[in-house]
Amino acid sequence: TLDNEPTYSYHGYACADYYQIDPRYGSNELYRSLVAAAHEKGIKFIQDIVPNHSGTAHWWYNDLPFQDWIHQHPTFTRSNYAMSGHSDPHAARTDLDACVTGWFDTSMPDMNLGNPYCLQYYIQLAVWWIEYADLDGIRVDTYPYTRKEDISAWTEGILKEFPNFTLVGECWFHNTQQIAYWEGCRTADGGFK
């Protein structure tokens, strides 16, 4: 997707337009042709989608649809990246909150999927790309940096439309216990998916 912040976002994850392929890589039509060509060769196609954060160059940053569209704090608050707070029953609530509401960087606002309209925006975004490009799967960037209930609702929204669709969440963990917590979570932890 389009990232208009190459100075701050060398990696392309500060999205400015979720519905446009970054022109450095081509166009929407070229992307759709690439997926079709892959399918002709029997290759499945998985797209990366980032529901956790966008970029400050996105139009909504200066004209938020709702004040709680993004997580806001009195001063800039970076995520502490303490994802273990999800699975550790002894973790401090403040650590988990800092993980799931803190911004990734000063140019990457943290989206609030707890806002039902923001959640629906991201569900419809995924549905649109699946249908437009004929995707076979989605890799969900920074999956555990969003509240479990919210990312679960996003996942359920997509699977409601496409029950057999492949979703793979990125979880940067370095030990078996933390990875296992997120593995096959379709019925674990009170319905978390």
PLM regions and their residue ranges:
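Active-site-proximal helices and loops of the catalytic beta/alpha 8
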Residues: V35, H39, H53, Y61, ...
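Active-site cleft segment of glycoside hydrolase catalytic domains centered on the general acid/base Glu
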Residues: W69, G102-P116, Y143-G157
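Short, solvent-exposed loop/turn and secondary-structure capping segments
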Residues: N4-S9, I49-V50, T56-D63, Q178-Y181
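An active-site-proximal structural segment forming one wall of the substrate-binding cleft
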Residues: L30-F45, I49, W59-M83, D88-P89, ...
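Aromatic- and acidic-residue-enriched carbohydrate-binding clefts of CAZyme catalytic domains
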Residues: L2-A36, P65-N112
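Conserved structured core elements
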Residues: G12, Y25-E29, P116, Q120-I123, ...
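Structural recognition of the beta-strand scaffold that forms the well-ordered cores
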Residues: T1, D17-Q20, K44-P51, G137-V140, ...
